[in-house]
C-alpha cells in the first residue's frame, strides 16, 4: 500500500479543484485546498512554522504542491517563488494550459524545471503523477543540466535548449502529461 501523501492545491476553478480533491482522497491522500496563490503561500507558511523535524521525515509539510499557473491575486509562478524561498526542496507541480510558457518561466524565475500537467486532463493522471515519487530524483538530474546550461551561457537556456528540456521532461514524466 502506498503511503498517505499530503498535497496542497492552489486552483481558482472550484470545479477543477473538487475533481482533484475527490481523485486524491479516493486513493487515501490528505488534501488541503486554496483558491489563489496568496492563500496557498499563507497556508504553506503556517504549515512550515508548525512543522517539527520529527513530524515528517522529509522536513516539508507537503509531499507535493499543485499550483494553477494562472490565478487571481498571486499567480502560480509567484506562489512557487515564495514557497521555494521557504523550502527549496519542495516538490512543485504546475497545472497549466500554457506548458511551454510555464516551463520557460519556471526555469528563468525558479532556476529549475518543475513538473507540468497540461490542462485539460483527467484527475487520475495527476494522482498517478503525484504518486510517482521517482520523478523527483530524475528532475534533480534535469535541474543539474539546467544549472550547467545557465553557468555556461551566463543566463537562461535559449529557445532550442528549452525544446530539449521540454522533451526531457516528457520522458521523465511517464504519464505523458505534457
Residue ranges and their predicted role:
Residues 11:
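Conserved acidic carboxylate
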Residues 51-66:
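Active-site beta3 strand of CheY-like receiver
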Residues 78, 85, 99-116, 124, ...:
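Alpha4 helix (beta4-alpha4-beta5 surface) of REC/receiver domains from two-component response regulators
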Amino acid at each position: 500500500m502506498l503511503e498517505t501523501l499530503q498535497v496542497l492545491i492552489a486552483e481558482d476553478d472550484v470545479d477543477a479543484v473538487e475533481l482533484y480533491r475527490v481523485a486524491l482522497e479516493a486513493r487515501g491522500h490528505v488534501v488541503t485546498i486554496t483558491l489563489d496563490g496568496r492563500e496557498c503561500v499563507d497556508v504553506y507558511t503556517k504549515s512550515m512554522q508548525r512543522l517539527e523535524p520529527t513530524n515528517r521525515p522529509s522536513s516539508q509539510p507537503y509531499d507535493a504542491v499543485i499550483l494553477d499557473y494562472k490565478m487571481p491575486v498571486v499567480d502560480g509562478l509567484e506562489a512557487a517563488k515564495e514557497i521555494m524561498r521557504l523550502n527549496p526542496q519542495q516538490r512543485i507541480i504546475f497545472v497549466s494550459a500554457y506548458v511551454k510558457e510555464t516551463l520557460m518561466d519556471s526555469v528563468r524565475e525558479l532556476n529549475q524545471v518543475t513538473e507540468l500537467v497540461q490542462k485539460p486532463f483527467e484527475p487520475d493522471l495527476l494522482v498517478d503523477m503525484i504518486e510517482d515519487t521517482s520523478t523527483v530524483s530524475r528532475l534533480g538530474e534535469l535541474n543539474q543540466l539546467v544549472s550547467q546550461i545557465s553557468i555556461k551561457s551566463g543566463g537562461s537556456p535559449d529557445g532550442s535548449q528549452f525544446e530539449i528540456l521540454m522533451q526531457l521532461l516528457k520522458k521523465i514524466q511517464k504519464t505523458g502529461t505534457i
